[in-house]
UniProtKB/Swiss-Prot annotation:
Entry's family note: Belongs to the mediator complex subunit 32 family.
Region called Disordered, residue ranges: 128-151
Gene from which the chain derives: MED32
Localization in the cell: Nucleus
Name of the protein in question: Mediator of RNA polymerase II transcription subunit 32
Organism: Arabidopsis thaliana
Function: Component of the Mediator complex, a coactivator involved in the regulated transcription of nearly all RNA polymerase II-dependent genes. Mediator functions as a bridge to convey information from gene-specific regulatory proteins to the basal RNA polymerase II transcription machinery. The Mediator complex, having a compact conformation in its free form, is recruited to promoters by direct interactions with regulatory proteins and serves for the assembly of a functional pre-initiation complex with RNA polymerase II and the general transcription factors.
Record note on quaternary structure: Oligomers. Component of the Mediator complex. Interacts with MED6. Interacts with GEBPL.
GO terms for biological process, alphabetical: abscisic acid-activated signaling pathway; cold acclimation; leaf senescence; positive regulation of transcription by RNA polymerase II; response to hydrogen peroxide; root development
Length: 151
């Protein structure tokens, strides 16, 4: 993370120096178009692009950290490993109380996550129907689910 911050800081400093260079070259040229001003503008454009790249990299890093924290929180919540802010330990009554669902193992959570990802990919490809599923379009329900067959 320090490398990303340092890279962003250096790119910003170079960008600011390049913008100052443009202003100084315009002032020394008396507002007239000059080779020195054109060179300063090219340098400014280059530093601007490098600064944007550094910003994009920092944004990607922040997003990946947010996703990792979210995943860790999801696993902690699902497996019952949550803690309270005060005291650092959650009583058994508090763990899982928010959802009133029993905790599941991290392995089971990962299996379910993979299954959901697979289904999303299948839906994106347009198939939408898992192999072996029996779906009757004329009746409007999926016979795999007993609650649908009572309709």
């Amino acid at each position: 993370m320090d490398n990303i911050v340092d890279s962003l800081n250096k790119a910003y400093e170079k960008f600011v120096l390049a913008s100052a260079g443009v202003l100084e070259s315009k002032e020394s040229a008396g507002g007239q178009k000059a080779l020195l001003t054109d060179t300063a503008l090219e340098n400014f454009k280059e530093k601007w692009e490098l600064f944007r790249v550094a910003c994009d990299q920092a944004e990607e890093f922040v997003e990946s950290v947010k996703q990792r924290i979210g995943s860790e929180c999801l696993v902690d919540e699902a497996t019952g490993l949550t803690t309270t802010a005060a005291g650092g330990q959650a009583p058994a009554a508090v763990t899982g109380a928010a959802t009133s669902l029993p905790p599941i193992s991290a392995v089971r959570l990962e299996q379910m996550s993979r299954a959901v990802r697979w289904l999303v990919l299948e839906l994106q490809r347009g198939s939408g129907v898992a192999p072996g599923s029996v779906h009757s379009s004329s009746t409007g329900f999926d016979s795999r689910f007993s609650e649908d067959s009572t309709q």
